Amino acid sequence: MPKKIVRVLIEGGKATPGPPLGPALGGLGLNMGQIVKEINEKTSSYSGMRVPVEIEVDTETKKFEIRVGTPPTSMLILRELKAEKGSSDASKKIGNLKMETVVNIAKMKLASSNTPELKQVVKQVLGTALSMGVTVEGKDPREVQREVDSGAWDKLLGG
């Protein structure tokens, strides 16, 4: 069974049968309405962000599978802060995140991460926050990373 894989970037919850989906999937005889509906359902939580989407199509049976990636960590942080962009100077602070928010972002990124450990992904999110000029719980993210290492956040991390 020949398969075709199509990779596109879609704004969360706003896929349409037009470009980039239409040209990429046109001619395969698929129900575009069904594909668009499923993509929009799976990406609705990423409204306002571009999300990587992969559609795997069995060209004989016309069955398809949709896989949705996660936006970059920096985009998730900006969405939480309702900010347009990070600071060009990490010493200039653009906002503050609660540790619960950092953990939620880490949970979103866990599936696509190189490590199965939530604690490590939390530290990666903290590193991104640092480079963007974002504090966590009113502190420098490096300080919060040390707290994570010492076990101070284990209760929140399920550890």
From Swiss-Prot:
Signal peptide: none annotated. The keyword Ubl conjugation does not apply. GO terms for molecular function: large ribosomal subunit rRNA binding; structural constituent of ribosome. One of its GO terms (cellular component) is large ribosomal subunit. GO terms for biological process: translation. Residues 137-149 have a biased composition (Basic and acidic residues). It holds the Pfam family Ribosomal_L11_N. InterPro entries: Ribosomal_uL11, Ribosomal_uL11_C, Ribosomal_uL11_C_sf, Ribosomal_uL11_CS, Ribosomal_uL11_N, Ribosomal_uL11_N_sf. Residues 137-159 are annotated as: Disordered. Disulfide bonds: none annotated. PROSITE patterns: RIBOSOMAL_L11 (PS00359). Keywords: Ribonucleoprotein, Ribosomal protein, RNA-binding, rRNA-binding. Part of the ribosomal stalk of the 50S ribosomal subunit. Interacts with L10 and the large rRNA to form the base of the stalk. L10 forms an elongated spine to which L12 dimers bind in a sequential fashion forming a multimeric L10(L12)X complex. HAMAP family: Ribosomal_uL11. Belongs to the universal ribosomal protein uL11 family. Forms part of the ribosomal stalk which helps the ribosome interact with GTP-bound translation factors. This is Large ribosomal subunit protein uL11. It comes from Korarchaeum cryptofilum (strain OPF8). The lineage of its organism: Archaea, Thermoproteota, Candidatus Korarchaeia, Candidatus Korarchaeales, Candidatus Korarchaeaceae. The gene is rpl11.
